[in-house]
Amino acid sequence: MKILQICYKPPFPATDGGAMGMNSLTEGLLNMGHSVKVLAFHSKKHPCNIATMPKDYIERTSFETVFVDLDIKLIPAMEAFLLGESYHVKRFISTAMKTKIAEILKREEFDIIQMESIFLTPYLPLVRSLSKAKVVLRSPNVENKIWKRTYKATKNPFKRYYLKHLSLTLANYEKQKVNDYDAIFPVTETDAEYFVENGCRRLCKAVAVGMDTPEILPDVLEEENTIFHIGSMNWFPNVQGIKWFLDECWRSVKAASPQVKAYFAGRNMPGWLLNYDEKDVHIVGEVDDSIRFMTSKQIMVVPLLSGSGIRIKIIEAMSIGKTVIATTIAAEGLMYEDGKNILIADTPKEFADAVKKCLEDPAYAKEIGKCAARLIATKYNTDNIAKEISRYYKELLEA
């Protein structure tokens, strides 16, 4: 098959969860012998320098990128607010991207055009006018669910009202446009059920994100009595979750396990976190090698209060045998068993109890990690995921 993959941000280098999810599918489809061309947006938030990318990747994917200014602008935001339109979607409308898509589709024919976000839907009419390919939405999450959970956790009444507006306009947009695609492939069963319950009449199947276990782990000692979090801090649910953890959970965790130290890694750390000053809390910032960082620490904590889709950093940590303590929302979409391959904690006391149990009983924690690694190896193998979605693509083309 010949596939055009259109991405809302650069899938390579795969340094954050979203990029890892897109890139793993690219690699899996290429491994199967399919032809995959990658076209991606890049922005100030998600920059891309082709000159620094591996030549092999560029050649295999015929990689191209288009800049889009995603900075929030007051007047367009107010216009969208007054017109009841989704400002999230409007920010991704780009004349340069329209020109690039038209150029590609006039030059090449594709069997499948894979859109990596609902935010790319404004380009669907153009794609339909220039291509006979089946057009599918690979949905990493249900965007409006993220904002719904976010506004419900927001105390400022004005901010809460505006975030609610963003959530509702995005929900309406998703419901209106989802049937314009030939098929929808969310990454979780939860999201697939949401689309069907909200009117999706197209083929809608959950296809997980692939993650291969590294053959060789970094030669680094695991620091005892440590917990860690790693994630992009330009994603609001991560910021919200870490603030809640430090404000509401850390004292309970520290009281239960006085010896524990916490490490927080990720790009674009906000100023308040960089200036956070408390004993045994270490703000690491961006790391060059996420696997090396995770290998050097003991237990991952993922205290998300909002979000949708699947947390790829959890899958990455599980793949190397790390014990993960996460909220129910953070673990949403994973095929987990609480107490077997992950530990679920939704309150400060539950986090404190789980951390204490793992630190006091390392063998227990190690067993959780081993079971987690087995889960990822069997259920989230990159090539198996690519085979699954390829089977659905074949069905679409033969229908």
Model-derived segments and spans:
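A short, well-ordered alpha-helix in the C-terminal region of glycosyltransferases
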Residues: 364-379, 385-391
